[in-house]
């Protein structure tokens, strides 16, 4: 199936060292920053019993196999909070999930999270919440993703005392 964004963020969190403040002072370690480029929709398999999906998801969830169902929902920001609570910043580039008004799957599974618009709906709101202050940008189809990502990188670099590989 699609993308398990929250699972990916949890995996990143598990392999990141304890961050420093990036001051380049003796004993300090680099500040950690995670860049997330996404359309903001988790599309993952969850257990039929005991799994949870957003309360606004369209139920019943589609059956994937005998033990799982397919959950499509905006990012659950729990993993973001865990990462940020460790002192790791998160930069988010939202490649907007644009409306597909003639597509039945979109209308029945995604549209309720993308209202009133892709820039202001639940998907965008959760990604803004995931991002560290000042480190959120969005781009629509036809927009310049490279420029948006470069601008985010410049924001991160200009607010970090030193960069290390």
Per-region residue spans from a language model:
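P/S/T/G-enriched low-complexity
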Residues: 1-165
């Amino acid at each position: 199936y699609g993308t398990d964004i929250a699972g990916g963020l949890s995996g990143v969190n598990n392999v990141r060292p304890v961050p420093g403040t990036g001051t380049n002072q003796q004993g300090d370690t680099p500040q950690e920053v995670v860049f997330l480029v996404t359309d903001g929709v988790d599309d993952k398999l969850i257990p039929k019993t005991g799994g949870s999906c957003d309360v606004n998801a369209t139920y019943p969830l589609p059956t994937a196999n005998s033990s799982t169902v397919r959950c499509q929902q905006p990012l659950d920001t729990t993993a973001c909070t865990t990462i940020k609570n460790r002192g790791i910043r998160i930069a988010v580039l939202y490649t907007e999930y644009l409306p597909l008004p003639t597509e039945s799957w979109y209308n029945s599974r995604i549209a309720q999270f993308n209202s009133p618009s892709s820039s202001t709906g639940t998907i965008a709101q959760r990604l803004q919440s995931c991002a560290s202050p000042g480190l959120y940008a969005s781009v629509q189809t036809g927009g310049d993703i490279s420029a948006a990502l470069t601008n985010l990188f410049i924001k991160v670099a200009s607010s970090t005392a030193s960069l290390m590989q």
